[in-house]
Amino acid sequence: MAQTPAFNKPKVELHVHLDGAIKPETILYFGKKRGIALPADTVEELRNIIGMDKPLSLPGFLAKFDYYMPVIAGCREAIKRIAYEFVEMKAKEGVVYVEVRYSPHLLANSKVDPMPWNQTEGDVTPDDVVDLVNQGLQEGEQAFGIKVRSILCCMRHQPSWSLEVLELCKKYNQKTVVAMDLAGDETIEGSSLFPGHVEAYEGAVKNGIHRTVHAGEVGSPEVVREAVDILKTERVGHGYHTIEDEALYNRLLKENMHFEVCPWSSYLTGAWDPKTTHAVVRFKNDKANYSLNTDDPLIFKSTLDTDYQMTKKDMGFTEEEFKRLNINAAKSSFLPEEEKKELLERLYREYQ
């Protein structure tokens, strides 16, 4: 019997990676169809190899993508399908608005250097990837009746891709794309300051493109400060380690900075040490602006309810707090004002 959801009301999710939210069945299907070897040939085995039950280091977690990304990348049908199925997955979880993020380059096999996942040159460019994801998301919106927008990721280790990400954000602005992100390994020394990233984020500011940055997940508060002061981020992806710098944390509290919190993810990636109190408890107690998110549900074998159950059972979160954080998520979403207002009105109505 399925357990009762911890929060059985409409939810908003702002931090989830498309390439970390693929159905194992779909990976198997395209592995067979494209003749690409996978480490397992049943859904159950594949879920256990790709999935995690206990904490791994961040590199150990990132290695999981190597198993299945070659099966999806460079395949038009697969790229569109994972976007469509993502919307179905979120609709089933009771999400009414979600922002999903991905790197166009990591799903391409043409006009991308270096070539990801040891693929041979094909004909799917980063621009094609965005177009295909948009098609899948928009068809999913029609079929499942929820609203979905997308965020394009720059990668910390590939600053040479970032200006193209900016151009794609401009080209597809409001055609599902609402913002830019910086993802990848934040422990790469000085990566927030790589000229490619800085220039892309400056361009985003100039062009009115919204901005979020992964920072303070496993990195120091300094990475969060760089994200805010240099990259001019409007939201912080994770941000747990911000609380180690009281002055910075208090400043961001005053500025109403939004933290995209992923509790179950932070346990499995080792971003949070379970012997300590989770930063989200501090955020709750300080009435900070934050949301709850899945991050990579395929790898964490989770749904959004996993994160709600964890905070409810282990951290004493209440229904009132769940309402508050979802309203904050809607307020901090990258929707245009009119659509944001509609979303908020819906939440207020359903939360009464």
Curated annotation (Swiss-Prot):
Keywords: Acetylation, Cell adhesion, Cell junction, Cell membrane, Cytoplasm, Cytoplasmic vesicle, Hydrolase, Lysosome, Membrane, Metal-binding, Nucleotide metabolism, Zinc. Disruption phenotype: Lethal at perinatal stages. Fetuses are viable up to 18 dpc, but after this survival decreases rapidly. Fewer that 10% of mutant pups are born live, and these die within hours after birth. Mutant fetuses display much higher than normal levels of adenosine and dATP, respiratory distress, hepatocellular degeneration and necrosis. Prenatal lethality can be avoided using an ADA expression vector with a trophoblast-specific promoter. Mutant mice die after about three weeks due to immunodeficiency, disturbances in purine metabolism and severe lung inflammation. The record marks 58, 62 as: Important for interaction with adenosine receptors and increasing their affinity for agonists. The active site is at 217 (proton donor). The modification N6-acetyllysine is found at residues 54, 232. Transmembrane segments: none annotated. Detected in brain neurons in the median emninence (at protein level). Expressed in secondary deciduum (at protein level). Found in all tissues, occurs in large amounts in T-lymphocytes and, at the time of weaning, in gastrointestinal tissues. Changing residue 217 to S: Loss of activity. Gene3D superfamilies: Metal-dependent hydrolases. Substrate binds at residues 17, 19, 184, 296. Binds 1 zinc ion per subunit. The keyword Metal-binding applies. The keyword Zinc-finger does not apply. Belongs to the metallo-dependent hydrolases superfamily. Adenosine and AMP deaminases family. Interacts with DPP4 (via extracellular domain). Interacts with PLG (via Kringle 4 domain); the interaction stimulates PLG activation when in complex with DPP4. NCBIfam families: aden_deam. Catalyzes the hydrolytic deamination of adenosine and 2-deoxyadenosine. Plays an important role in purine metabolism and in adenosine homeostasis. Modulates signaling by extracellular adenosine, and so contributes indirectly to cellular signaling events. Acts as a positive regulator of T-cell coactivation, by binding DPP4. Its interaction with DPP4 regulates lymphocyte-epithelial cell adhesion. Enhances dendritic cell immunogenicity by affecting dendritic cell costimulatory molecule expression and cytokines and chemokines secretion. Enhances CD4+ T-cell differentiation and proliferation. PANTHER family: ADENOSINE DEAMINASE. This is Adenosine deaminase. It comes from Mus musculus (Mouse).
